[in-house]
């Protein structure tokens, strides 16, 4: 494995961060299952939405980069095998939409993390990788499956250095999530 562009972080550090990426996406998937569950009340869903958004660049809102440029809010691409379409929406709207689906029960199963790419250096203090996951969605009414699919997604992942009063540390933040395939 070559890390020519990442010479200020060791290969061991980068492997550790890749493992943390897997943990982050598992946490996000857990939040999705709570947000989509009809068993949880709206107040509980709002708590999980806020926690989920903390995993993303800008926490679901437009944000300023280190050059003080405004960057657009992170987006999630959604798809449907029934309509054979893909559309981009802001991640916070995606999460909000999960709370109001017309099914009596929604199941979003834990993602299988298929692959996390090597991190590459974007600039000082910022690295980027991509991960590929599979996610299963099941929508039911009266105990019968009305719709189900498996979606393969790619998610941008950022390793960002944050400077604090006691030094610096790297944090992992998720970025845009695109659909590769839905079946």
Where are these regions (language model features)?
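Sec-dependent N-terminal signal peptides of Gram-negative exported proteins
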Residues: 1-4, 157
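Short, low-complexity N-terminal intrinsically disordered segments enriched in polar/charged residues
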Residues: 3-50
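Hydrophobic, Leu/Ile/Phe/Ala-enriched alpha-helical segments that form helix-helix packing faces
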Residues: 28, 32-35, 56, 157-163
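Short regulatory "switch" loops immediately downstream of catalytic or recognition motifs
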Residues: 30-37, 58-61, 136-140
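N-terminal, helix-rich and Lys/Arg-enriched segments in bacterial and organellar proteins
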Residues: 32, 52, 56-60, 127-132
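Short linear functional motifs in flexible/disordered or boundary regions
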Residues: 40, 64-65, 143
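Short solvent-exposed beta->alpha transition segments
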Residues: 45-107
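Exposed beta-sheet edge and beta->alpha loop/turn motif
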Residues: 108-183
């Amino acid at each position: 494995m070559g890390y020519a562009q990442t010479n200020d972080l060791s290969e061991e550090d980068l492997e550790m961060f890749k493992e943390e990426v897997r943990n982050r996406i598992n946490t996000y998937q857990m939040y999705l299952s709570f947000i989509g569950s009809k068993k949880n009340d709206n107040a509980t869903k709002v708590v999980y939405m806020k926690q989920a958004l903390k995993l993303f660049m800008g926490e679901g809102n437009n944000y300023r980069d280190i050059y003080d440029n405004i960057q657009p809010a992170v987006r999630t691409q959604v798809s449907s095998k029934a309509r054979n379409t893909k559309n981009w929406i802001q991640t916070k709207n995606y999460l909000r939409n999960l709370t109001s689906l017309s099914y009596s029960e929604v199941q979003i199963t834990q993602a299988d993390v298929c692959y996390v790419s090597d991190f590459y250096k974007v600039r000082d203090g910022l690295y980027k990788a991509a991960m590929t996951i599979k996610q299963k969605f099941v929508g039911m009414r009266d105990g019968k499956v009305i719709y189900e699919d498996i979606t393969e997604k790619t998610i941008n992942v950022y390793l960002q250095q944050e400077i604090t009063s006691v030094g610096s540390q790297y944090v992992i933040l998720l970025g845009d999530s695109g659909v590769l395939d839905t079946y």
